[in-house]
A protein has these predicted regions:
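Short alpha-helix boundary/capping segments
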Residues: 42, 60-63, 86-97
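A positional/architectural concept
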Residues: 1-65
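A short local loop/turn or secondary-structure capping micro-motif enriched for an aromatic residue
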Residues: 30, 47, 74-75, 90-92
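Helix-adjacent hinge/juxtasegments
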Residues: 56-77, 82-84
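Acidic/glycine-rich phosphate/pyrophosphate-binding loops and surrounding catalytic core
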Residues: 89-168
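Compositionally biased, intrinsically disordered low-complexity regions
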Residues: 37-40, 73, 164
Length: 168
């Protein structure tokens, strides 16, 4: 048993609201500002900035997926600490909230203009839009069939031609 545990890394995912996940895992894949990054037990020390996206946890042949928002990850041998603003399992994501957040971000971007009438991109508005878009992509990839169908329905009813407008 001890030898088996040696090949696992202790993963902690912490948000301001809860200790989202704690457990021994075989491997983890996270969304970083430099792209997707994977690690296992014994990885050299590492710190990375997180981007909104999917976190993939693998242990004992089972794979779990969760959605992470902005934050950071620190790896130190047998411990990986992820601190982020929010973390959600697919079944906990509210689809209507995602669509509304994306629409609000687009509206904020459209209404903020410089003196020449050109859009001024507020970092907060762009970040809000990116989080919503990352959640939509997460559901399209890892959500249940019902969630994917509902998301497609929301996109059709809320966006022309069912296409999501670009942020910028």
């Amino acid at each position: 048993m001890a030898e088996h545990e040696f090949h696992k890394i202790n993963l902690l995912i912490i948000t301001p609201y809860e200790d989202f996940y704690e457990g021994m895992v075989d491997s983890v894949r996270i969304p970083t500002s430099d792209g997707e990054f994977g690690f296992m037990a014994g990885h050299s020390p590492f710190v990375a900035a997180l981007e909104p996206g999917a976190c993939v946890l693998t242990t004992g042949g089972e794979t779990k997926y969760c959605m992470l928002s902005e934050g950071y990850c620190e790896i130190n041998g047998m411990l990986a600490l992820i601190v982020c603003n929010s973390a959600e399992w697919p079944e906990d994501i509210r689809l209507r909230r995602i669509i509304n957040a994306y629409k609000a971000a687009i509206e904020e971007i459209k209404t903020h203009q410089d003196k020449n009438g050109r859009p001024v991109f507020s970092e907060d508005s762009v970040a809000k839009g990116k989080r919503a878009l990352a959640r939509m992509r997460f559901i399209e990839r890892y959500g249940t069939d019902q969630q994917r169908e509902r998301l497609a329905d929301y996109k059709k009813s809320d966006f022309p031609d069912g296409k999501i407008p670009r942020l910028q």
